[in-house]
Amino acid sequence: MLIPHLHFCGCCGEAIALYEKAFHTKAESIVYNRDYAPDECPDDDRIAHAVMDIHGQKVFLNDRFGNKDKSLDCAVHLIVMFPSVEELLACYAFFKEESTVIDPFVKLPYSELSGNFMDQFGVQWGFMTE
């Protein structure tokens, strides 16, 4: 099994809240640093480990090694396949205002609608229809 692991810089909780709304899902589990290492980090609200299901794919998330610079120069982004243009656009509406477009949404020979963007947390996404 291959599991994408998304890293954030202290904003993992915000990302989880957005992804829960956009993808109509809930985090399966969240472990905070204060729970993971209570003696060392009793008041640390950063997330040590979280698990979500996004479109049928298990995804891990945490507050380590995040993309501080939010650079577009990245070799990896997550592709989400939608059954319809309407569902794609409804999900993208949650990201649109604070995202950076990498490739605008257009019709391609293999997809009715496809586009790439970086969300406000520095995660790069590709949304396309099946």
Mark where each language-model region is.
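Short, solvent-exposed beta-strand edge segments and adjacent coil->beta transition regions
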Residues: 1-3, 73-77
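Core segments of cupin and vicinal oxygen chelate
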Residues: 6-56
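Glycine-centered flexibility motif
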Residues: 10, 73-75, 115
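Vicinal oxygen chelate
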Residues: 28-29, 48-53, 63-70, 80-130
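Short glycine/proline-enriched turns and hinge-like loops at secondary-structure junctions
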Residues: 43, 71-74
